[in-house]
Amino acid sequence: MNIGITDPLNALVPMVVEQTPKGERSYDIYSRLLKERIIFLTGPVEDNMANLILAQMLFLESENPDKDIFLYINSPGGSVTAGMAIYDTMNFIKPDVSTICVGQAASMGAFLLTAGAKGKRFCLPNSRVMIHQPLGGFQGQASDFEIHAKEILSIKDKLNRLMAEHTGQPLDVISKDTDRDNFMSADQAVDYGIVDSVFKNRASK
């Protein structure tokens, strides 16, 4: 069973056939890579995807609590609550979670990228990173707008403080830099402290 992605194009996911003592066994490619402790965070961050990633992390912890997990990120961002569920689980489990940006890590994707274990956060050379403040949209009674505005400001402050902790940047710098969309190359993400290094090939690891 493929538990790596939630995209409707799942039908196009290639299968891998392995020879075992009991005969042939087939896996979809994501389930096969899960055996190598590789998890993919692809597409918008939302509740269903977050639940699948949480389940995979907890499963891999039960398999071996002392071996690293590798989280490959290619995401435009998405739900803060779904992202924080992934973030909290990354910190809750015993294995280190190494994060690798392929393509893009924007918004909550960038936040999860920098939340990887120190020294184990990477970008591929042509990937892009984007940080900004959380977006809010609300429809309802006028009396509720103030409540939701306060909640958005509280979330913004929490995310900025955590980003400052993970990057080593001063809080006022993070607050200023996330006020608008802030795009970075892989090398700029290293300089900023979002990742630790750029992988050009496996030999550079």
From Swiss-Prot:
Enzyme class: hydrolase
Function: Cleaves peptides in various proteins in a process that requires ATP hydrolysis. Has a chymotrypsin-like activity. Plays a major role in the degradation of misfolded proteins.
Active-site positions on this chain: S107, H132
GO BP terms: protein quality control for misfolded or incompletely synthesized proteins
Any single GO CC term annotated in Swiss-Prot or TrEMBL for this entry: endopeptidase Clp complex
Gene designation per UniProt: clpP
Subunit-structure text: Fourteen ClpP subunits assemble into 2 heptameric rings which stack back to back to give a disk-like structure with a central cavity, resembling the structure of eukaryotic proteasomes.
Keyword annotations of the record: Cytoplasm, Hydrolase, Protease, Serine protease
EC number of this enzyme: 3.4.21.92
Identification of the protein by name: ATP-dependent Clp protease proteolytic subunit
Coiled coil, from the record: none
Family per similarity comment: Belongs to the peptidase S14 family.
Location(s), subcellular: Cytoplasm
Organism of provenance: Pseudoalteromonas translucida (strain TAC 125)
Source superkingdom: Bacteria
UniProt catalytic activity: Hydrolysis of proteins to small peptides in the presence of ATP and magnesium. alpha-casein is the usual test substrate. In the absence of ATP, only oligopeptides shorter than five residues are hydrolyzed (such as succinyl-Leu-Tyr-|-NHMec, and Leu-Tyr-Leu-|-Tyr-Trp, in which cleavage of the -Tyr-|-Leu- and -Tyr-|-Trp bonds also occurs)
SUPFAM superfamilies xref list: ClpP/crotonase
GO terms, molecular function: ATP-dependent peptidase activity; ATPase binding; serine-type endopeptidase activity
